[in-house]
Amino acid sequence: MKILLIGYGAMNQRVARLAEEQGHEITGIIVPDKNNNYPYPTFEHISDAEGADVAIDFSNPELLLPLLDEDFELPLVVATTGEKEKITEKLEELSQKMPVFFSANMSYGIHVLTKLLEVAVPLLEGYDIELIEAHHNKKVDAPSGTLVKLYDVIKELKDNVNPVYDRHEKNEKRQPDDIGISAIRGGTIVGEHDVLFAGVDETIELTHRAQSKDIFANGALKAAERLVTKPKGYYTFDNINN
């Protein structure tokens, strides 16, 4: 594949390295600071990257959202977290004319975790639920896009949910519909996500721990390889392999 990268931070640098190791070609990058000495051609617009087969985005909403308003038909893999509703709304529109893929976490293991939640939440009705995520000290957004994804899965399965982000502001006992959401930032933690079900005299945890950021880069590459074979449409890990 010939790949256009949107953003060239730590994640897309990994994508570039792994892509070239696997025989793919990086045709260029879209970055906000074009004066840096990048190893690839820089572009302002997606449509400028002639010859690209697919674009892979690991950037931020400030860079990505204006690009999604442009006129292009290049298959697009998006992994940006933050401003999820705005991004997915624009991707839904673009999917009417080209294939697009979105995931808040490019790890297939996280996708499996969401499927486990779909089984566990109905079976553990009445258990208190807490969501905890931990990342490195350079991650900006909190809670992580992945934790939001896990919360969204739970919200679809329960009649009423009340997210609680800051307990020190609540001077009352925990309510049955509360879902505690906690974010930890420190060191070089790649990414950890825990779903805690607390019942009477027992707890059950579902946990995913990323041991290398390569899992996200490889996940994006595998999604791109599938996406370029697909007709127009909106794809996620739920349907990309159909």
Curated annotation (Swiss-Prot):
Active site as annotated: H135, K139
Taken from the UniProt entry, a GO cellular component term is: cytosol
* Reaction equations catalysed: (S)-2,3,4,5-tetrahydrodipicolinate + NAD(+) + H2O = (2S,4S)-4-hydroxy-2,3,4,5-tetrahydrodipicolinate + NADH + H(+); (S)-2,3,4,5-tetrahydrodipicolinate + NADP(+) + H2O = (2S,4S)-4-hydroxy-2,3,4,5-tetrahydrodipicolinate + NADPH + H(+)
Q: Which Gene3D superfamilies match?
A: Dihydrodipicolinate Reductase, domain 2, NAD(P)-binding Rossmann-like Domain
Alphabetical UniProt keywords: Amino-acid biosynthesis, Cytoplasm, Diaminopimelate biosynthesis, Lysine biosynthesis, NAD, NADP, Oxidoreductase
Keyword Ligase belongs to the record:
no
Q: In which pathway does it act?
A: Amino-acid biosynthesis; L-lysine biosynthesis via DAP pathway; (S)-tetrahydrodipicolinate from L-aspartate: step 4/4
Residue runs in coiled coils: none
**Keyword DNA repair on entry:** no
Q: Which residues bind NAD(+)?
A: A79, T80, T81, S103, A104, N105, M106
- One of the GO biological process terms: lysine biosynthetic process via diaminopimelate
What is the protein's major site of localization? cytoplasm
Q: Which SUPFAM superfamilies match?
A: Glyceraldehyde-3-phosphate dehydrogenase-like, C-terminal domain (SSF55347), NAD(P)-binding Rossmann-fold domains (SSF51735)
InterPro entries linked to this entry: DapB_C, DapB_N, DapB_N_CS, DHDPR_bac, NAD(P)-bd_dom_sf
Mind listing the GO molecular function terms for this protein?
Answer: 4-hydroxy-tetrahydrodipicolinate reductase; NAD binding; NADP binding; oxidoreductase activity, acting on CH or CH2 groups, NAD or NADP as acceptor
Enzyme Commission numbers on file: 1.17.1.8
Q: Which residues are noted in the entry as (S)-2,3,4,5-tetrahydrodipicolinate-binding?
A: H136, G145, T146
Q: Where in the cell is it found?
A: Cytoplasm
Q: What is the documented function of this protein?
A: Catalyzes the conversion of 4-hydroxy-tetrahydrodipicolinate (HTPA) to tetrahydrodipicolinate.
Give the UniProt family note: Belongs to the DapB family.
Under HAMAP family, the record lists: DapB
Q: What is this protein called?
A: 4-hydroxy-tetrahydrodipicolinate reductase
- Taxonomic lineage of the native organism: Bacteria, Bacillati, Bacillota, Bacilli, Bacillales
Q: Which gene encodes it?
A: dapB
